């Protein structure tokens, strides 16, 4: 049986490291805004909540032009809070199970739906590629994720993809999600093919990554 739940897209941030004066949701990859690609990816998901903050009106207009039934949540404190605050706001409008998707993350469609259909609380891991990775340390090198840190390197990076009960995603604080998750470890994990956009080099890599998939994440 296919899993159920709500995808919460955290799209409230200012994307300052890209230097484009745009929220990452509106930054174009292969000619389309990132959030448009994400909504293509989520075409088979019924419940989607988009959390907005910086340039909220522009993001809302774009989201609703593509997916009129999407729910919108607001993080009015986007300038002084982290992704965990946005995830908490979005979780208030979600069902019992939440899949958290950062607004700067593009995920291979097949891998995303494999992740979606995991019934347990789970993290999405990949090999480290970003400039400021959150490293995932595994029990005995291959078991559950037992530690998340930006200080000690490992062969795995948490890409920000998370599936968990709503009571977990709504209570991770107002800073970094990985900091809030520490009290909920250990967690299961699967690997995902994805690209995260933090800086201009990541943006160029995202374009190449998406071009390899025909320029689209739609089904």
Short names for language-model regions:
Residues 18, 59-63, 206:
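Hydrophobic packing residues within well-ordered alpha-helices of enzyme cores
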Residues 25, 69-71, 186-188:
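Conserved beta-strand segments of alpha/beta enzyme cores
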Residues 84-92, 137-139, 201-207:
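Short, surface-exposed amphipathic charged segments that create phosphate/polyanion-binding patches used
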Residues 102-106:
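The conserved acidic donor/metal-binding loop of glycosyltransferases
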């Amino acid at each position: 049986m296919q899993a159920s739940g709500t995808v919460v897209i955290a799209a409230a941030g200012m994307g300052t490291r890209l230097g484009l004066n745009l929220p990452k949701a509106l930054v174009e990859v292969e000619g389309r805004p990132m959030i448009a690609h994400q909504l293509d990816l989520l075409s088979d998901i019924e419940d989607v909540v988009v959390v907005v903050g910086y340039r909220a009106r522009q993001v809302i207009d774009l989201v609703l032009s593509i997916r009129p039934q999407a729910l919108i949540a607001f993080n009015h404190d986007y300038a002084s809070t982290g992704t965990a605050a946005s995830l908490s706001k979005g979780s208030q409008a979600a069902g019992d199970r939440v899949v958290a998707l950062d607004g700067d993350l593009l995920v291979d469609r097949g891998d995303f739906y494999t992740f979606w259909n995991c019934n347990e609380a789970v993290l999405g891991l990949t090999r480290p590629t970003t400039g400021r990775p959150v490293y995932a340390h595994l029990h005995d090198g291959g078991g559950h994720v037992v530690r998340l840190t930006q200080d000690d390197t490992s062969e795995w990076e948490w890409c920000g993809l998370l599936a968990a009960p709503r009571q977990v995603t709504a209570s991770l604080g107002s800073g970094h999600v990985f900091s809030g998750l520490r009290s909920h470890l250990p967690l299961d994990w699967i690997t995902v093919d994805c690209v995260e956009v933090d800086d201009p080099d990541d943006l160029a890599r995202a374009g190449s990554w998406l071009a390899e998939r025909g320029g689209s994440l739609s089904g």
